[in-house]
Amino acid sequence: MPSPAPSGLAPGFLVAAPALGDPNFAGSLVLMAEHHGEGALGFVVNRPGPVTVAEVLASVDEDLRRAAEANGRAGAPVLVGGPVQPERLWILFRPGGIGADAEGAVPVGNGLSLGGSRELLEALVRAPRGDPFLLLLGYAGWAPMQVEREVAAGAWVPLELEGSDLVFDVPLEQRWETAVRRLGLEPGGFLVGGGGASA
């Protein structure tokens, strides 16, 4: 069984406990990208939004939309990364190869990198071999000590980030349940005190 994340929550996952009351995060799996004394930043990686990759790309560049259609990526949902800055586009991808040297790309850890530049977006969308990536709008943010209090209250259960498979290889609708089982639990088998990230 994977061990819980160490005291620093990033890189790692936060698994929402079943009774988490915040509608922004109920049933969510959050990839934690930053966690330090000034707060924390993460991305919900299992909540599809109302727009597709094609719709977002069409607002950037019609040629990119056509490239996504040619690569079979156009119909994929853009995920709701969180309630903070919902208009901001983020790109989550596997480092190495396509996009590895793109401007602004930063490693999250254990097989995942994050960016938001147009250069990175173009490289990934046009890649002929189909390197996996996710587009996310918005992020989840926590003030200093907020996420620690929420974890202590039972709103979230930390899970170690052991690779990118939970993000890219597990179907969207199964990610939360898979994470719960990796904790050695069954869905519905643990309780929550409350809490939620900032909006």
UniProtKB/Swiss-Prot annotation:
**Alphabetical list of SUPFAM superfamilies matching this protein:** VC0467-like
Gene Ontology CC annotations of this record: cytosol
Signal sequence, renumbered to the chain: none
Gene3D superfamilies for the chain: VC0467-like
Q: Which HAMAP family match?
A: UPF0301
**Record family assignment:** Belongs to the UPF0301 (AlgH) family.
Q: This chain belongs to which protein, by name?
A: UPF0301 protein Anae109_0457
Organism the protein comes from? Anaeromyxobacter sp. (strain Fw109-5)
